[in-house]
Amino acid sequence: AWFHHPDLPGVLPHTFSAPPEACLVAGGFVGDRFQEGMALLPRLAGMLLMVSDKGEGRVRAFSDGRADMKYTFAPGDVNRIKQGLVAVAEVLQAGGAGRLHVPVHGVSPSNKPEELAQKLDDRAIRDFTLYAAHPMGTNRMGTDIEDGVVDSWGRAHGLENLWIADAGVFPTSLGVNPQLSTMAIGHWVGRHLHTVLGG
């Protein structure tokens, strides 16, 4: 289940299913708090927050083959994460939650969404436990090499035999789970590649 908050475009809170230990770690129950989390597990509910980020990054290769990766969050991304967590807290409280735990360093459990909002106010991005799923827009489709990495058929600009058919060819993050869209891109590129290769 998921919901769109009208005031939070690009933020998609939804339920998720994961092994109990993964839920505890995602909820900040690590180290000394893991035992506390295990005791709460029968009464614990969680939600996931997907954010269509606007930050930018790059990957370069060093001459020795190592990768140099840089990513910078846009200020609005951090604010939308905070607002999204408060929206999730409101939903969970409406469903009967008594205490609200978030995976943010230095933020203790809250009893009300308003209290959580105050605690999140001065938190920096480094305080949040984040991970990337379904990366998109890393090999954008575009009409030429200045506009994108691949053409509209998935062929890399400037390379004869490199085709890309995954979520990386989207122009940006879709803000939703991209499984169906990725399958459609794979089918599109695959059919064209089959034709080009004379299949």
List each language-model region with its residue ranges:
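A conserved FAD-binding loop/helix module that cradles the flavin
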Residues: 172-193
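Structural signal for hydrophobic packing residues in well-ordered secondary-structure cores
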Residues: 85, 89-96, 190-197
